[in-house]
Regions:
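A short alpha-helical cap/connector motif
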Residues: 1-114, 118-184
Length: 184
């Protein structure tokens, strides 16, 4: 499992993201356990020259956080345009589409996927995990809002205990989970 340090996360400089964001800038200042942006930035620094998929970006703040390590490439997906694609950062590519329809993904380069999709009902998340299993992809999945409602709690509780880590104290107040997906 991933070792995390709350003080280290709290000390991360998030000014680069705050300066580029067009909405919700104050959330980058939030301490771990309230917002997950510092956790995302920290995790992006744990590997280099990989691809990170940000699924459900809305206003782009998750992609900005995940882009902290400039050696990685972030591909950010949203079904509808909500303004994020106006943000310019050299290691972020914005796509207005369902990531499952993107034939350009080089799956062997993808190390981390953030799933933060509406509605948070556990069904969409399950569909996406099934899709990734069909692709035979393995890596780290970050799941947002795992304690938001009964449906998400049920979804989270059905995942294998030995493959998951509840990191809510470092992430978002409504629940953040890490899933080691298809890892042996």
């Amino acid at each position: 499992m991933i070792e995390l340090n709350k003080e280290e996360l709290a000390a991360l400089d998030m000014s680069y993201a705050k300066d580029l964001a067009f909405k919700g800038q104050e959330n980058f200042d939030a301490e771990p356990g309230k917002e997950a942006y510092r956790l995302y930035a920290y995790l992006s620094k744990t590997f280099n020259y990989k691809t990170i998929l940000d699924v459900g970006t809305r206003f782009g703040n998750s992609a900005l956080s995940l882009s902290k390590n400039g050696r990685n490439k972030v591909v950010s997906y949203n079904i509808t345009e909500e303004g994020a694609s106006q943000i310019s950062k050299k290691n972020i590519t914005w796509k207005i589409m369902d990531f499952r329809n993107d034939d350009t993904i080089e799956w062997e380069k993808v190390s981390l996927i953030l799933l933060d999709v509406d509605p948070h009902d556990g069904k969409k998340e399950r569909e996406m995990l099934d899709f990734l299993a069909e692709k035979n992809w393995s890596g780290i999945i970050l799941l947002d809002d795992i304690h938001l409602n009964g449906q998400m709690k049920d979804f989270w509780n059905k995942l294998p205990e030995e493959k998951k880590q509840d990191v809510t104290e470092f992430g978002h107040a409504s629940g953040t989970g890490i899933l080691e997906f298809n890892k042996q």
